Amino acid sequence: MKVITCEIAWHNKEPVYSLDFQHGTDGKINRLASAGVDTAVRVWKVEKGPDGKAIVEFLSNLARHTKAVNVVRFSPSGEVLASGGDDAVILLWKLNDSKELEPLAFQDEDEAQLNKENWTVVKTLRGHLEDVYDICWTSDGNYMASASVDNTAIMWDVVKGQKVSILNEHKSYVQGITWDPLGQYIATLSCDRVLRVYNTQTKRVAFNVTKMPSESGAEGEARSYRMFHDDSMKSFFRRLSFTPDGSLLLTPAGCVESGENVTNTTYVFSRNNLKRPMGHLPCPGKATLAVRCCPVYFELRQALNKGEVSQKSSPALLNLPYRLVFAVASEDSVLFYDTEQSFPFGYVSNIHYHTLSDISWSSDGAFLAISSTDGYCSFVTFEKDELGIPLKEKPQIHVRTSVVTEKKVKKSQPNKVISPGSRLTEGTSLSTPTLQPKTPVAAAKDLPSTPVGIKNVPVSSSEERKISQPASQSTKVNQPRRITLNTLQAWSKTPRRVNLIPLKPDTPASVYTDTVPVPPSSEQEHERPLPSGDSLQNPPASKRPRTEEMPLSVSAEDQIGCKPNK
C-alpha cells in the first residue's frame, strides 16, 4: 500500500468536494470525475505507472453549473455522470463521440480547446430548492436519489427525467443518501441526528434510528443518548453506504457515549435488522464522514498456521462466503476494514492540511482516491492481490423490480414540499439499461442478524416510527369527515430498559493493534506551502460561486506524475 498526493491544482486550488471513479468499462480506462468550489466538473484518466505511482491525465472540463459542485457520481454502467451543486440542480452528462463541442456560453474557449473528450448535458433534473449534497444510483441505473439542504431527498426516474417521490421527514440538512443494491431500501443521514430508512415501494419510512440507551443514568432511571453528531460536525457531508451485496449498511458521523467519554465511530447495521446497529467501528481521531466499499469481491483468507487463528483472528462482521473491503474516511484519516474482522487492517493519516471530503474506489480495487478541501487529491495504491485474491465470478444477487412511479393525476398533498417541476433539457434521451435481475446464491434471510463475537448495541424502541392509520370516514351524508390528529407523544412507546455493555476506556487504542503503518514517504512534509492557520481545527471555508473565469491549471498535452509525500 502506497500513499501519494498529486501536485495538481485539481480545481484551481479551490476546495475539492467530491470525486468518483467510473465503473462498468471493463477496465479499458480508469476515468475519475472531480468537482469543487470552482463550479466545474473535471474528468481525468488515472493509470498506474511501472513504479506503482499514479499517472493522471486531464481529459475534459465540464462547465455548466453556476455555483459550487458538491457531488459527482457515475451510473453503474459508467455511461452517465450525475453532478449536483449549490445551484440546486442535478445535471446528467454523457460522453459525446462527435466532435461537436459544448456551447461556448458555458465554457471558456481556451479551456474548450484543451478537452480531449466531449461531455454534454442530456438531462437537467430540477426539484430541490437548495444545495444538492449527495447522489446515489440504483443497480440498473434507471433511478437515482438525491439529498439536499432543503431537508428533503428526492427519488428520480432517470429515463423520464421526472420526480418519483419527495421524502421530506428530515428536520434539517440531508447530507448523505444511499440506495440499497437489492432495490428495497433508501437510507438517508441528516444533521438532525436521525438515520431514516425508506421502503422504495411504499415511499414511507421503514425505520428511524436516532438514540440508544445509556448506563450513565441513576439506578431506576432510563436515559439515552444520540447516536449521531449534530450540526457542529466540521463537514458538509455524511456519505453512508450499503455493501455491494446489500448485506450491511455502514453509517458515518456516529458517536458513542460511555460515561463522560464520547468516541467517534461508524455504525454497522445488518440488513436483517436495520432498527439497531449490530456493532460499531471506533475512530480515535476526528468524526467520520464517508464510507465507500470496494466493488471487488475477494476470497476468504486462508489460515497459514492453525495456531495463529486463535491468537490473531478477530470477530467477523458477518459470516459471508466471500470477503468485502471498505474504507472509512474521517476528517483527517482513512481506515480500511473487511468483513472478516472488526479491526482495521490499514490506516492512513496526515496526508492533507484540510478536512477530507470524499473517497472512491477504482473498478479493479487498485486505487482509492481521496479528495480534500485543501484543493488537492491523494491516491492509495495497492499491488496485485494485496487486498486479497478476487473471486473469478461475482456472486449473483437478487434485485427487486423497479420502483413504482406516482400517478400523474393526484390530489394535492399538503405534506409534500412544493418545488419547481422537473423538466428536460437539450436533447439526447438516456437509453434504458438492460441489466437483468440475477438469481441469488443464498437468500438474504439466511444471513445471520448477529454474528458470533459482535456485541449488540441496543436502541430504544421508543424511536421506532409508527405510521398512523387513516381515520375512518363518516357514512352520514352531507357531514364532514372526522379526522384524528395524532401527536408525536401518541406515536411513541414507553421505552424499555436494556443493559448496554459499556465501552472500556482503552477501546479506541486497542483497535489499532493490527493496523498497517503508513509508508514512511507519507510522513514527510509536502512540497506545497502550508496554509495559514490550523485548518483541521476550523470548518471548511464557506461555499461560494466562482466570481471570475480562471485558467485551467493543466495542459492537455501533459501527463502529470504524482509524487509521493515528502
UniProtKB/Swiss-Prot annotation:
List, alphabetically, the SMART domains matched. Answer: WD40
Q: Where is the composition biased (Polar residues)?
A: 425-437, 469-478
What is the protein name stated in its UniProt record? Chromatin assembly factor 1 subunit B
Q: Where are the WD-type repeats located?
A: 11-54, 64-103, 127-166, 169-208, 228-279, 351-392
Q: Where in the cell is it found?
A: Nucleus
The gene for this chain is CHAF1B
Do you know which Gene3D superfamilies this protein is assigned to? YVTN repeat-like/Quinoprotein amine dehydrogenase
**Gene Ontology terms describing biological process:** DNA repair; DNA replication; DNA replication-dependent chromatin assembly; nucleosome assembly
Annotated organism of origin: Gallus gallus (Chicken)
Domain of life from the UniProt record: Eukaryota
What SUPFAM superfamilies does the entry give?
Answer: WD40 repeat-like
Quick one: a GO cellular component term?
A: CAF-1 complex
